[in-house]
Amino acid sequence: MKRILSALIVLASIGAQAQVLYVNNSDNTFEAVNTTNVKQITFDSAQQLVAVQGTDGTTSQYATAKVDSISPCNNGGAALTYSNDRTVVFDAADATNFPEIVETIETDTLIDESGDFVENYRTTKIITINFSETGVTCNSNVSDVTYTVTNNSHIVINSTRSKVGYIVRGTCSNGSLKIYSTKKFQIMVNNLSLTNPTGPAINIQSGKTVYFTLGTNTTNTLCDGETYAAPTIAANGSEEDQKGTLFSEGQLIFNGTGSLNVTSLGGHGICSDDYIRIRSGSITITSLKDGFNTNDKFQMGRTANASPIVKIKADGNGVDCGKGNIIIEAGKLGINAGGEALKAEYDGTDTNITANTIISGGYITARTNDEKSSIFKTSGDFTLNGGNIHGDVKGNGSKIINSNGNITIRGGKITGIVDGSLSSDTTTAGGFKCDGDLLIDNGTVALNCKGEGSKGFNCNGTMTINGGDITILATANNFVAAEYDRKTRAITGNNITINGGSVFAKSHDHAINGTGITVNNGAVHAISTNATAVNTATTQTGGWLLTQDAQ
């Protein structure tokens, strides 16, 4: 009774000069509501919830156990703590202000990762390969590193020697380098410009690690041809791979501070049948197929002295990992892809293989153009620990994140703009799509899904928000056709639990649609322009639930 009388007295005392109504919480926080819109203050039958109802259709609901008092302010001393309108834009500052993880060089040779660091590799033999328009020369004079040259400028190296390094330089518009090696080795490109009109510019037929060093203050260019010649037949009778402009059977580890420009007219840009790791350097790829294509993982980090800058324009996927993880910890990565921007997808039957995506630092800006493409496509889990991401998808049925597993946001910032509507097979466009659970502990998520029938969050598992700042806009009309009807919603899923943070969801249809929503803490603002804002059973033990139904 005391709470009811207090609410009535407060409502009656709001005069013409009062501008802000404060709801003061027991944890010393408050919400400020515009009094000019206050219609009434009510309690539920059990007096567990108090609701401030506005003439504009808004309802601000609180758990009475967490509210100390409700009081008006006549001097307009504080701004309102909510707005019914938000925008989603790409912040230019994200490109310069982002966290990075500086790698630790592993020196323990018993740990596999130690093999990724050229700092642990000491060359004992340096061989120089010079290309020119009239031919290629090689200064190898040892029996365990032999070479042959065909058509003046196509050189093949055969090596059984360990701790060898190749300095490759010069300019040639019709040449190539192929290396067979039983040991790991280092390639140091030094102002190399090499084009092979009939295949890869560099083809490494070795399953061993290759340290690919971009010489300081050097600019290097590789290009293949539109049509590849018939592949070489290996000793076992199989055809040798020649999948792109720069191809390796083994691991490719990039380091150095120079630049590498790769153009692929007939295959992938840079390809490994193992994994690719970029530690530093500037790499630009223009590719007919994928930018980077790996059979295993793709990893970007940074050394203590430099971080990588990678730019990809690909008609296929920007980065494609067949059965490995995508790991990005530092650097700048820009992608304009016809297909998926970053794809870690394993479609085999080995249950021990998972393809996850883990972003812990750096700045990623990516755009996709094809139908049903995504910025991140992963058959495993997607995790954002840190870093800034800008995603712009244009195709119908496309997503910012499309995960067959779980999506976890622990920090960082992701901004996504989705322009597409339904695809030809009625797949909806949207922000986050996960077949598993969605967990947000911290960070910033801002999504604007502009197409008809779009979904902001679409989660088949449970959805838990413990913190962070989340904005989801999905305000286009529903997609209505003779045979189906796809609703435009900000959040749709099963059980949704809000334990903290700020959630702003605005949509044409229900802003929140699910099996049930529980608000224990935090602020949830749900607005619908054409339906009820929340279409699910609601339990509230704390926090602030502001809803605005269509008028």
Q: Model-predicted segments: where are they?
A:
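Sec-dependent N-terminal signal peptides
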Residues: 4-13
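A composition-driven surface/loop motif
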Residues: 82-83, 96-551
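Mid-chain, structured segments of secreted extracytoplasmic proteins
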Residues: 55-79
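Short N-terminal segments immediately surrounding and downstream of signal-peptide cleavage
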Residues: 20-38, 54
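Structured surface patches comprising rigid loops and adjacent beta-strands/short helices at the edges
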Residues: 35-43, 63-72, 91-98
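Extracytoplasmic low-complexity repetitive segments enriched in small/polar residues
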Residues: 19, 33-34, 48-50, 60-67
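Short polybasic amphipathic segments
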Residues: 19-23, 48-52, 77-81
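Sec/Tat signal peptide C-region and signal peptidase I cleavage site
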Residues: 14-18
